[in-house]
């Protein structure tokens, strides 16, 4: 849904990923809500297997997220070259579960888990794209503070939704 660009944070001297809401979607309330939901979801998550959010804002009418730049390839791209070995599968699966476990413990359900939303980096697998995430109550989160998503068709990829 968003456009992602590689950028340089000159203040902190690091490469970052900047995700913007395209101008043709910025007037769409549903697209804006989804973009904001992604920011809220990942802002509460700090885990080595989840892409880190550094900043969120709006400049010149453009909504943006500044995130950790992930070098590597998506699991989808990797699988196009063939299956993972047993060892790779266990390592990747464990890392994905660790990231999901953190998200779930924090009350965030990803809802769009698929190989294209998992980045394989030198340090391990990282979950990305929480645009369809849903907040759910946990014992640490009062239900009254959560915004639930709209009813209707299910979200996510048809094969995994």
Where are the predicted features?
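Conserved ATP-binding/catalytic core of the eukaryotic-like protein kinase fold
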Residues: 1-161
